[in-house]
Amino acid sequence: MPNDRSVKRSVTVLGAGLAGTEAAWQVACAGIPVTLVEMRPVRRSPAHHSSDFAELVCSNSFGALSSDRAAGLLQEELRRLGSLVIRTADDHAVPAGGALAVDRGRYSAALTEILDQHPLVTIERREQMDLPEVDAVTVLATGPLTSESLANDLRGFTGRDDCHFFDAASPIVHGDSIDLNLAFRASRYDKGDADYINCPMNKAEFLAFREALLEAEQAELKDFDQESAKFFEGCLPIEELARRGEDTMRYGPLKPIGLWDPRWGDVNDRDVRRAKRAYAVVQLRQEDKDGRLWNLVGFQTNLKWGEQRRVLQMIPGLAQAEFVRFGVMHRNTFLESPQLLDPTLQFRTRRHLLAAGQITGTEGYAAAVAGGWLAGTNAARLVRGLDPIALPNTTMAGALTHFVSEAPTKKFQPMPPNFGLLPDLPERIRDKRARYGAYRDRSLADLEPIRALIPEPLLA
């Protein structure tokens, strides 16, 4: 492949989500012309609300910031690799306790403007109906909402039906419609500032709320069988959690542990704590820079919009909530990547074609960015006649790309960043936080040889 004279001297990136945006930037910054193809607004998807690049359709959070957490380690790796998408997230961060969350409108608009102004980036607003010609270096980053025509061509090329699951997004409410006489500001265990709004429930309120969720009418989903619906376990609809058992929500998004309203009394008084602590707590996270919009954390849902209003207004503090956006559910498509891709994210049967992002079977925003970084970097290297690179599997980014290219395929499912993907440490460390810190230290050290390959301007 290196020095292949048939390779075109430019790159095409299909899809301007998180992965495609990062891939296009890496190609352009390597001095290679890149065409970024995005079907919005010519063709809308069921989940997007704008035509801007890298729109966050589920949560506005990239996950934990701390580098001794899996998501935080991946973010730090990407910062060190010169990721535009993560750097811009840092620039547009909103308060979210120990997490990296962004003002999603300003964030996407900023990334769109940056790419639009780059002299080597050509943006084409159109639907790509099929894969480009064989000798074109192409990054497939069309995401979980790949259009049907392109998905059909992809099935013909791979000889495989796509895998899929159903994903959902949480509702968003106006902050000034939240009753802070009932709700309170705090972060769990008082970590960071009081960045969340918390709506406490007693047992009777929780049980009535769960019953309402179970009885509420769901929206009809197109093109799928209700009985065989597959959900991603990391983004289950709240009504699905309610169905799984009385306490499932209380050990998930509604867990009350570590949350205390000072108006209840002294948290250090055991009797007060036992008498006053909440049975369950609904949390809302700031959605925009100005704190006017708040999303219900973990409240992905497929309820009809009228039912969402009725049921969610049962939550203490949200009786008069004004909804900016209701929750929606959509089908997510991904490749059976272990049968198709190498750790370089090249297709094994077509080396000029690379894939990145959620379509490869990684889960989470930072994971999509990591795939975009690697695919874009390797696309540029192919055009320049250089060997593509694979990231060390001791890094979180490398562990994810090795997983999607090597995992057993009996039941391949999307995978988020997690320390279980990393090879064992040389010595066993019993303390979990210390162990995760050791994983981090090894990862960042092993990333240094890769950083040496990156042009200096990208590392600034």
Curated annotation (Swiss-Prot):
Top-rank taxon: Bacteria
Enzyme class label: transferase
Pfam family, one: GIDA
Cofactor(s) required for function per UniProt: FAD
Catalytic activity, as annotated: uridine(54) in tRNA + (6R)-5,10-methylene-5,6,7,8-tetrahydrofolate + NADH + H(+) = 5-methyluridine(54) in tRNA + (6S)-5,6,7,8-tetrahydrofolate + NAD(+); uridine(54) in tRNA + (6R)-5,10-methylene-5,6,7,8-tetrahydrofolate + NADPH + H(+) = 5-methyluridine(54) in tRNA + (6S)-5,6,7,8-tetrahydrofolate + NADP(+)
GO cellular component: cytosol
Keyword Cell cycle: no
EC numbers, comma separated: 2.1.1.74
One Gene Ontology term of the molecular function aspect: flavin adenine dinucleotide binding
Alphabetically ordered keywords of this record: Cytoplasm, FAD, Flavoprotein, Methyltransferase, NAD, NADP, Transferase, tRNA processing
Subcellular localization: Cytoplasm
First and last residue of the signal peptide: none
SUPFAM superfamilies per UniProt: FAD/NAD(P)-binding domain
Biological process terms in GO annotation: tRNA methylation; tRNA wobble uridine modification
Family: Belongs to the MnmG family. TrmFO subfamily.
HAMAP family (alphabetical): TrmFO
Function of the molecule: Catalyzes the folate-dependent formation of 5-methyl-uridine at position 54 (M-5-U54) in all tRNAs.
Record's protein name: Methylenetetrahydrofolate--tRNA-(uracil-5-)-methyltransferase TrmFO
Species of the source: Synechococcus sp. (strain CC9902)
The organism's taxonomic lineage, starting at the top: Bacteria, Bacillati, Cyanobacteriota, Cyanophyceae, Synechococcales
Gene name of this polypeptide: trmFO
